[in-house]
Amino acid sequence: RRRGVEMLFHPGTHDCVAYDMAWGGAEHPDIPVYLGANTGHGKRGHPRLERGQSNKSAFLLTHFFPEEISGRLLVPPKVEHALVDDAIEVIVEFPDGYEPEGGSIWWMFDRAPDGSPQYLSEPIPDDNFAEMHYDDRRGVWCAEIELDANAEQIDFFSIYLSRVKHNGRGYETYLS
């Protein structure tokens, strides 16, 4: 970043070449990432996966032709969670000026360790999906996930939509 380099990391949640997402997110939280649910080399993706995303095109157009772009790419948000009775509330806040148009969340209980065969092969269940909602009072995006009483851990990630335009053509972009 000191050299003016822009980055967008675009792995899948089940990709054999990007199995260390949790480590990467913890060590480099300022790098924008898009995680397609259940995607990776040879993976079909989750039934609720975003179709028609144009992240790479939007990223390149924004980088090389910034004066010709309307709209802006999102930056990584601040993510927090809190236990609420038998659920976990996920709270996501974007910096001022970065307003997503919508969001969704996926989760898995007791996912296998990073890089293990099970980590890469066991998909996020089809039903483990919800739309995020915007809380006007708090100025944050929220979702509540009912916890599995038998689970020891939960992995969740959320995705947010923004659009940019170049020469009248719209590009849907997503950020996790």
Where do the language-model regions lie?
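Short conserved micro-motifs at the rims of enzyme active sites and ligand-binding pockets
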Residues: D20-A22, G45-L49, R169
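Alpha/beta-hydrolase
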Residues: M7-A18, I88-E93, E101, E144
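Active-site proximal loops enriched in glycine and acidic residues that flank catalytic Cys/His/Asp
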Residues: P11-T13, A37-T39, V92-F94, W107-F109, ...
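Surface beta-strand/loop "capping" patches
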Residues: F59-W107, N128, D135-R137
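The feature captures the conserved acid-bearing segment of alpha/beta-hydrolase catalytic domains
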Residues: R1-D30, Y34, K43
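C-terminal beta-sandwich/jelly-roll accessory domains of carbohydrate-active enzymes
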Residues: P95-S176
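Catalytic histidine-centered segment of alpha/beta-hydrolase-like enzymes
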Residues: T39-Q53
